[in-house]
Amino acid sequence: MTAPTPCHHGMAKARGCSQLAVGTFSHLFPELKPLTITEDEAAAIGGPGGVMHDFDGASPDSMVPAGYIFFAQFVDHDITLDTSSALRPDPDSHQAKKVHEFVDHLGNIRSASLDLDCVYGFGPEASPHLYDGEHMAVGENGIDLARSPGGTALIGDPRNDENIFIGQIQLAFHQLHNRIFDERVYQRDITDTGWTRFGAAQRETRYHYQFVVLFDLLKRICDPKVFTFAAERICNTKKDFPLCYKRDKHDKLPMPVEFSTAAYRVGHTMVRDRYALNAKHREVELFDEAFGTLGFSALPEELVPDWRFMLALDPCVTPHMSKAFNAVFANELMDLPIVGSNNANDRALAFRNLMRASALGLASGQAIAEEMKTKGYPLDVTDLKLGKVKKWKRVADVLHKSGTDLSKNTPLFYYLLRESELASGGARYGPLGSALLLEVFGGMLRLCKDTFIEPFETGNWRPDPCIAGPDADFDKGRLIKEPDHYPLDLADLVRFAKRLDATG
């Protein structure tokens, strides 16, 4: 078997992902009028040389360690996979009804739940190639994913081998399951619980993952006021939540395109052009073929990442931080190594995001902000001050020719980026972006059948002290309301999974 051609996030349909859909996509607000933009407008905003192009990498840092960029990508691959929608609008689907019908039938090959199906696949019997007995398969040297003789990673989602960093996140979750299985589950009496030892290890792995998504990743990147508002409802099963996300007519959770095509893609702005791999390779381009960061091949030992450069694992080593949450993209993301198109715009991820949102019939940021406000979220429509955006005159000239006014009807994706920049100075998501993330992630945690929320609320589950540390404080009030209180974070999972000591 030959290794697949590299295929990167947001570029093309995922290779090797031809399974039947397990769910569909949807609109949170199907009654809102879709906002359509032209290719010229999308290019002026998000194309090469457009207002979103950060040529010189001059954007400041956020306060989010760089490892969270790839963890967020891993989470995305756990809940969404669209292999059939087009980048450009269907000329026969301009009517809102047709767009909504198309989206409602658009298949999602991932389950809209934080169940780690990108790790576990369909289980040991249906996906035996992912397993080594009741362990998750890992490479013989312990530093790489298990691979076929041709180099293909044996994992639940081939996208998680598209670069070194996400591949190592995937490996960490294999190792986390294995260590929980070996060292934690056997110590507990599970004979009366109905769980097998494998099932108990899988459940613990999922619960720790879900906890970190809510109380580390989302708490870290979301507006604090919006986070507290949503988390108080997510963690109290007596309160109604989610407020607008709901199951479809088949009683399945769909994936809202406002989330998958706009809100979660704001995370692309966190990406830098270069990252430190380890002490020998302190500046490696994200898509550097010479260093193999393109993925889809075995990992040389010299390129094993030192996690201290990515997460706060060592008090003596300051990890690299992600780029600020603002309305510009790193140069690497504006010239993706895409195959099969001579259109320079198609290589710009920001352009692609804008065009895909238009094709899927997303409403404007202002319209969605009004709807989320009426649902109770603590937010207002943001004045984006577009006239003060650097190089906006180029966009204004294009808009003048087409007679379009984006100041009051801004594409949701760009609205969320600009909102983040204005609301927090680029430190985190703005209020609407935060509300959309928490509505959907919180909805998954409340509406899916097996998450940590109910056992945590009743006191029947807490994160393992051998993973979080013996002094970790999981008081719900502190978790919800206290900034910078992270008793279990991504660094703890990585430290335990990879058997690192306190200094990495």
Predicted regions and their residues:
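Short acidic, glycine-rich surface-loop motifs adjacent to enzyme active sites
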Residues: 177
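Terminal regions of secretory-pathway proteins
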Residues: 1-159, 163-164, 182-504
